Amino acid sequence: MPRSRINENFIDKTFSIVANILLRIIPTTSGEKRAFTYYRDGMSAQSEGNYAEALQNYYEAMRLEIDPYDRSYILYNIGLIHTSNGEHTKALEYYFRALERNPFLPQAFNNMAVICHYRGEQAIRQGDSEVAESWFNQAAEYWKQAIALTPGNYIEAQNWLKITGRFE
């Protein structure tokens, strides 16, 4: 049974109903409809913590989806799963790929910054301040990009940039 038919969550049900209506009334190819169905099912599985199932759906959506903008969100969600699983190198790769297709994803820049900041903190714990500084500088660059896209967001990042003297 497709995942879209087993959702119990009210928001997921509402999203599924609206998505199904839109799929019927907006002129799209059958491939686009199938890609969206896999994407929707991937989001549903991801929200429930079923990451393996979500990845299967996202990979299938990637195979079918041709629009770069839509692909960017699929790649971004794959990055989120790898982040949640602690697979930071893979996550960064997917965030980069998402940004190649859509450079206006502040959340991807933010997530990349968070990973770099985390790695900087790890380097400090290991006693390597030079490596830590490099990671922190990279985090700062990503946060600046996220903030440039959405100036009212990422207040904690803005504060960190100011406190550490990285805000220009």
From Swiss-Prot:
Record keywords, A-Z: Chloroplast, Membrane, Photosynthesis, Plastid, Repeat, Thylakoid, TPR repeat
SUPFAM superfamilies hit by this protein: TPR-like (SSF48452)
GO CC terms of this entry: chloroplast thylakoid membrane
Membrane topology: Peripheral membrane protein
Subcellular location per the Swiss-Prot or TrEMBL entry: Plastid, Chloroplast thylakoid membrane
SMART domains: TPR
Listed InterPro entries: PSI_Ycf3_assembly, TPR-like_helical_dom_sf, TPR_rpt, Ycf3/AcsC/BcsC/TPR_MFPF
Listed Gene3D superfamilies: Tetratricopeptide repeat domain
GO biological process: photosystem I assembly
PROSITE patterns: TPR, TPR_REGION
TPR repeats: 35-68, 72-105, 120-153
The keyword Repeat is assigned to this record: yes
Pfam families assigned: TPR_1
PANTHER family xref list: CELLULOSE SYNTHASE OPERON PROTEIN C, TPR REPEAT-CONTAINING PROTEIN MJ0263
Family that this chain belongs to: Belongs to the Ycf3 family.
HAMAP family: Ycf3
Biological role stated in the UniProt entry: Essential for the assembly of the photosystem I (PSI) complex. May act as a chaperone-like factor to guide the assembly of the PSI subunits.
Identification of the protein by name: Photosystem I assembly protein Ycf3
Species assigned in the record: Glycine max (Soybean)
